[in-house]
Amino acid sequence: MLEELNKKYDRLQLKYGSKELDSIYNGGCTESPDICFVFMNPTGRNIASLKTWKGRKSPWIGTKNIWTLFYNIGLLDEEIFNQIKSKKAIDWTYEFADEVYECVSKHKYFITNLGKCTQVDARPLKDEVYLEYLKLLYKEFEIINPKVIVLFGNQVSSIVLGNKISVSECRRKLFSKKIKGKEYKFYSVYYPVGNGSFNAPKAIEDLKYIIEEVRG
């Protein structure tokens, strides 16, 4: 079960994350989703990382940019998206966070980060830190059994695939990797938010292509 991994993530949060923030886990469709999206590492902009937050500890709660991306590629209902646009972070309730992730599940995708050690800001993490999370991420893949996995950015792609990856050189290229005897399919995509936001149009193009490939 995914929940059984959370205690391990909490221990790694104490080791590598901000002490005043909680680890952020994952969320979405957990039974053979069409796509598993793997981001880098959570920040304190996610209000679910606050210790006072007693709801789900899933990625991107209280933020806007990534939900705009999902809306633009057809993976978020307009009604939910309009509510997200109208809300400040503090306006998100536990119930609304659940509503958003019910919509994610309905659209058959799963959201996670390679790293789960929440930082106060979007500081870069060394490969060594991400490598401590790699086997746990592989375990997530094993549990949810996604059709395709999308890796955002060069660093995440390189660590998960075990090869030096430059997204600009492998756009729309299908990678295959065997993990515990099972073959998984991967695409490497530009990181679409934060420092990578200038690449968002290219990310959207490639994600639409991937969705079409997966769903036909």
Across the structure, where does each feature detected by a protein language model lie?
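A polyanion-binding, active-site-adjacent surface
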Residues: M1-V148, N154-S168, K185-F186, Y190-S197, ...
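Short, surface-exposed beta-strand/loop micro-motifs that present aromatic residues
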Residues: N26, L174-K178
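Catalytic phosphate/metal-binding cores of nucleic-acid and nucleotide-processing enzymes, i.e., regions
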Residues: C170-R172
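Ligand-binding pocket scaffold of soluble enzyme catalytic domains
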Residues: G196-K208
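Charged phosphate-binding loop/patch that engages nucleotide di/tri-phosphates or the phosphate backbone
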Residues: Y209-G216
